[in-house]
Amino acid sequence: MVERICPKCKIPMNTSKCVKASCQEKTVMSTTLYWCSHCNVPIFESVCPKCGSESKYIATDIRPVFPEERLLLALIQEKENPYCYDSASVWYGGGAYIINGKKEKISVTEINKWSLEKIKSIKEAYDSLAEGIDQSYFEENIALFVEANTDRYNYITEEAMRFVLTYKDKFEIRDMMVSFSGGKDSTVTSHIVNTALGTNQVLHVFGDTTLEFPTTLEYKKRFNKNEESKGVRILTAKNREKNFE
């Protein structure tokens, strides 16, 4: 939900200033996320679109914590069972990990004080345990998150497509371009542009800074082989003045 929030108190409210007498900070427009305890996922509405349960405010920005990071988190916290988060709904937002709807903060300052021996032992433990990670609950939880937020996804997709279409009568297809970095954001942008305009003839420009990961370059190759993006023209603009390799 897009609503006003106090940037200091991190609480959503419908006033131009914070309702707390001790604060009175000017509120700002923000995307507010809630937590549905029944579905155990974050949602964009105060009432869960899937189950109808009342939800509670959780953060203004959030990201999923993948199974590999969950294992590392458990090792850092010295949990008795390093796989304890395999069957939990774990996210990160507001400077804290959100585990089944409850926030847990990790002090990076304290971790930076750890000895190299301790960090090395955690790395060794992670390497030996990584193959035992169970991804099944994570996949189910993400699928539930997508289902619960389908209306929101559809809304922002349609909004983005309407925005792209406002330029259809202003520019020729040959004058348009997509800045393509090989990441998730530019992939979504490419999909929205091609779908909205009904063509894959919009030029994509890939900026090769020489700092790209090998996986990024590999994805660029695979991108052109996907059924949806097959035939998309990708022009590579390489940095030839400074080589960071």
Protein language model features and the residues they cover:
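ATP-dependent adenylation/nucleotidyltransferase module used to activate substrates
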Residues: 2-38, 42-46, 52-55, 67-74, ...
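Short, Gly/Pro- and small/polar-rich lid/capping loops
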Residues: 58
